Amino acid sequence: MVEQAQGSLEEIERQFLDVAQRDGLESLQEDVKPDVKSDLNGNGEEKRDRDDEDRKKRKRSRSRDRGDRDRKRSRSRDRRDRDRSRSRERRRDRSRDRNRDDRRGGRDDDRRREPQEPAKPREPKKYRFWDVPPTGFENITPMEYKNMQASGAVPRGSVQSAVPVVGPSVTCQSRRLYVGNIPFGCNEEAMLDFFNQQMHLCNLAQAPGNPILLCQINLDKNFAFIEFRSIDETTAGMAFDGINFMGQQLKVRRPRDYQPSQNTFDMNARMPVSSIVVDSANKIFIGGLPNYLTEDQVKELLCSFGPLKAFSLNVDSQGNSKGYAFAEYLDPTLTDQAIAGLNGMQLGDKQLVVQLACANQTRHNTHLPNSASAIAGIDLSQGAGRATEILCLMNMVTEDELRSDEDYEEILEDVREECSKYGIVRSLEIPRPYDDHPVPGVGKVFVEFATTSDCQRAQAALTGRKFANRTVVTSYYDVDKYHNRQFN
């Protein structure tokens, strides 16, 4: 019976295990089998206790495993959340960086493509107006000016008070000439060299160097513009009208935008000028005129001193100039100035002769007080004097200009640079005003050269130059007085 029962139990157990394996319940094998066996062999209670403990251990183990898995899953979720959070933050950072780069990308690209140049130091303001002549004194050299001062023809201070400031646009217009009918194929350099050479060959250049600074050619319309360094040389350059260049006869004219000074030629243009010059005490004779000068060109030369009352250019039967003319100024006091300024002037290959046409006529109100024979505190009745190493430049600066430290330094630099072109400059002195105390030599510029010959070259070159719209007057100065700072 026991064996039969045991066989039945084994059969039941086998069937149960098959079902358990099929349902994935292998763990129940150990639980069921001991219980059945314990019931059969009488040790059921003890085995049940052990089985209960085993089940509890397995449950605790499974609970621990499940807890471990839950904690791992939780940590994994936390790690994934943190990773996703970091990824989102990195994406936001990259997005912000891209937006920032886009906003400033243009500026950054410009900086990368075009690196900023280092800031250049401020260049000193150029104070150079050497070749801008004051109205009424365009053709007067310092020596002629001294003679006018000695005769009392120009009052003290009249140069500065009578000279309006010339704007740069007016100055540029007055220094340009139109050149028409230019030959095909000519270039700017060739034309520039040609006119500069002609200016020197005809003795029309007033200083060393090239009188013409710039040439601009319009090949499509067959004309050019040339720009001179001074107004005087520009007027003289009009004498080249009709000159032959590379087989072509050039047309030299004033540009359309040219406007003469309002205080001179414009006044004369508004008032009719008589073609008959009657005999009077103020009638002047102008001889030695180049035959190629037209009536308008001669009138323009005379009008640089003031408006004309009457003018007559003597011509032959064919209308060609005979080389002399007669004129009278609207203001009789301008007669002496024009004579002193024009007489002996070199114009082309000829020298002008300007004098009173009626010497026996009695003149009225043409002489000025003798006290007017000084300018800037120096007697101009004498010439430049004996040549020394010291050159004194007068009528260049005013007290107001010397009071400003910035202007004073710029004047010093400008004068030194210009004088260095003619020789070695050892020292330079420009006396400055001091409060209300009188300072000897204010308004004069003293330049010490290395040699007397250097000083003579500078005197010859700077004579008649213009500085700040003022005619520069030159004179040699005693060496001992200069070194002792006796500038009176």
From Swiss-Prot:
<keyword id="KW-0677">Repeat</keyword>
<dbReference type="GO" id="GO:0016607">
    <property type="term" value="C:nuclear speck"/>
</dbReference>
<dbReference type="GO" id="GO:0071004">
    <property type="term" value="C:U2-type prespliceosome"/>
</dbReference>
<dbReference type="GO" id="GO:0010172">
    <property type="term" value="P:embryonic body morphogenesis"/>
</dbReference>
<feature type="domain" description="RRM 1">
    <location>
        <begin position="175"/>
        <end position="257"/>
    </location>
</feature>
<dbReference type="GO" id="GO:0008187">
    <property type="term" value="F:poly-pyrimidine tract binding"/>
</dbReference>
<dbReference type="GO" id="GO:0048589">
    <property type="term" value="P:developmental growth"/>
</dbReference>
<comment type="function">
    <text>Necessary for the splicing of pre-mRNA. Binds to the polypyrimidine tract of introns early during spliceosome assembly.</text>
</comment>
<dbReference type="GO" id="GO:0000245">
    <property type="term" value="P:spliceosomal complex assembly"/>
</dbReference>
<dbReference type="InterPro" id="IPR012677">
    <property type="entry name" value="Nucleotide-bd_a/b_plait_sf"/>
</dbReference>
<feature type="domain" description="RRM 2">
    <location>
        <begin position="282"/>
        <end position="359"/>
    </location>
</feature>
<feature type="domain" description="RRM 3">
    <location>
        <begin position="389"/>
        <end position="479"/>
    </location>
</feature>
<feature type="region of interest" description="Disordered">
    <location>
        <begin position="25"/>
        <end position="133"/>
    </location>
</feature>
<dbReference type="GO" id="GO:0002119">
    <property type="term" value="P:nematode larval development"/>
</dbReference>
<feature type="compositionally biased region" description="Basic and acidic residues">
    <location>
        <begin position="25"/>
        <end position="55"/>
    </location>
</feature>
<dbReference type="GO" id="GO:0000389">
    <property type="term" value="P:mRNA 3'-splice site recognition"/>
</dbReference>
<dbReference type="InterPro" id="IPR000504">
    <property type="entry name" value="RRM_dom"/>
</dbReference>
<comment type="subunit">
    <text>Forms a heterodimer with the U2AF small subunit.</text>
</comment>
<keyword id="KW-0694">RNA-binding</keyword>
<keyword id="KW-0539">Nucleus</keyword>
<dbReference type="GO" id="GO:0089701">
    <property type="term" value="C:U2AF complex"/>
</dbReference>
<dbReference type="GO" id="GO:0009792">
    <property type="term" value="P:embryo development ending in birth or egg hatching"/>
</dbReference>
<dbReference type="GO" id="GO:0000243">
    <property type="term" value="C:commitment complex"/>
</dbReference>
<comment type="similarity">
    <text>Belongs to the splicing factor SR family.</text>
</comment>
<dbReference type="GO" id="GO:0007281">
    <property type="term" value="P:germ cell development"/>
</dbReference>
<protein>
    <recommendedName>
        <fullName>Splicing factor U2AF 65 kDa subunit</fullName>
    </recommendedName>
</protein>
<dbReference type="InterPro" id="IPR035979">
    <property type="entry name" value="RBD_domain_sf"/>
</dbReference>
<dbReference type="Pfam" id="PF00076">
    <property type="entry name" value="RRM_1"/>
</dbReference>
<feature type="compositionally biased region" description="Basic and acidic residues">
    <location>
        <begin position="78"/>
        <end position="129"/>
    </location>
</feature>
<dbReference type="GO" id="GO:0030628">
    <property type="term" value="F:pre-mRNA 3'-splice site binding"/>
</dbReference>
<keyword id="KW-0508">mRNA splicing</keyword>
<dbReference type="InterPro" id="IPR006529">
    <property type="entry name" value="U2AF_lg"/>
</dbReference>
<keyword id="KW-0507">mRNA processing</keyword>
